[in-house]
C-alpha cells in the first residue's frame, strides 16, 4: 500500500524493542512490499516473534476480525472496516494523501476513542514501541477502544447513500420539470 515501506522499517523494530515477555505474546500479521519481505521476516525471526508476512492477504476481513490491535493507514475503507468489526487501531495517515483526507478519516475513530492517531512524522521506533507496551499491559484500553470503534460503525451506509442520491435526483428532476 501507499507508504508501506515506512511500516516495514518501523513496526518490526518497534516490536523488537518491546520487553521479551511482551514479545512472546505477539502474533503478527504484516502486509509488506515485496522488496521488504526478507528484511521484515529476518527481524521477526531474530526476535522470535511469531509472524506471518505477505505482499497481500486475500482473507483480510477474517484477519481484522481476529486481531486484538491493528496498525494501519487510514483510508476510508480501512476505517469503515475497523469500525464494522470493532477493532482498536493505531492509525497512521498517509502524509501525502490528497487534502490530508486520511487524517480526517482517522479522526472519526480517534475522536470517539476507538483509535490512536499517530501522524507519520511521529512514527518512529521509540514512540510506537512505547505505545504498544502501554496497550499490551492495559487490556482495558484495547477493550474500551474496540467498543468505541464499533460504536462508529454505520452498517446501513450504502443504503443511506443510495436513498440520499435518489432524493437528490428526484428533487433535481422535479426542479427541471417546474422550469
What is each of the regions a protein language model found here?
Residues 33, 74-76, 93:
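Short glycine-/small-residue-rich Rossmann-like dinucleotide-binding loops
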Residues 61, 79-87, 107:
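Short alpha-helical segment that forms part of, or immediately flanks, the ligand-binding pocket
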Residues 1-70, 103-107, 111, 118-127:
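Donor-nucleotide binding loops and adjacent catalytic segments primarily
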Residues 141-155:
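A short, well-ordered alpha-helix in the C-terminal region of glycosyltransferases
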Residues 116-119, 123-140:
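C-terminal "capping" alpha-helix adjacent to the active site of nucleotide-linked donor transferases
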Residues 72, 88-99:
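Short hydrophobic beta-strand element within catalytic cores of glycosyltransferases
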Residues 65-79, 87-88:
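Acidic donor-binding loop of glycosyltransferase active sites
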Residues 154-179:
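C-terminal alpha-helical cap of glycosyltransferases
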